[in-house]
């Protein structure tokens, strides 16, 4: 079942010939496989894969152990987010990561992305959840600052700059992955803020703006497309399935607006 065809996606925007491994048997030779059929009720809502993973570990007798417990891993993750946190004149953003320079010294990149690899909005939501659970005010303040800072990336047509450092550019391509993450996470963050007694209607407005643009420009031929010029609203790439990232955004925003025409 491990097949990619008709082409294989092997690098950024690069396709190569299909990946389709085969087993060749000599005359008279045989091969056998074992398979397991698993039934049951998911331990966690919408996460049945957790059952499959636990059963696989049990029956395949996996002996590997986590080097750290889940709490240590979570704390290490938030520590890394602290390292990514960048103060700029407009507020707070998260760097996309660290890369080696010409001397192979890892330095923080001055590249800030709302979703996809940068995940500014998602990390902000995780910090809000951590505050709600453990009362860490530093995480609350950082999350709110990140989300409020990114409001400056919004455009009048409902879209937004997906790279903060590109604000003010005469042309900016926004892909559906970033826009989908942005809208979905802003809707979730609005929901969490409401539960914490924080009034952040502009967060929900950001999600509504993106979703409204997508619904207005939906095409039966290419769905939501892949990428759009955020300033003109013209679609520059309509191929592929990246537009599917808009679906979670629509669902999360609908939960708050109850408006099927959001």
Predicted regions and their residues:
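Solvent-exposed loop and edge beta-strand segments that line ligand/cofactor-binding
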Residues: 13-24, 102-120, 166-181, 226-245
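Extended ligand-binding clefts on enzyme/binding-domain cores
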Residues: 68, 72-75, 149-152, 159, ...
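Well-ordered alpha-helical scaffold segments within catalytic/enzyme domains
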Residues: 121-137, 181-199, 234, 244-261
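Beta-strand-rich recognition/accessory modules
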Residues: 1-64
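P-loop NTPase catalytic cores that bind/hydrolyze ATP
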Residues: 29-31, 118, 122-125
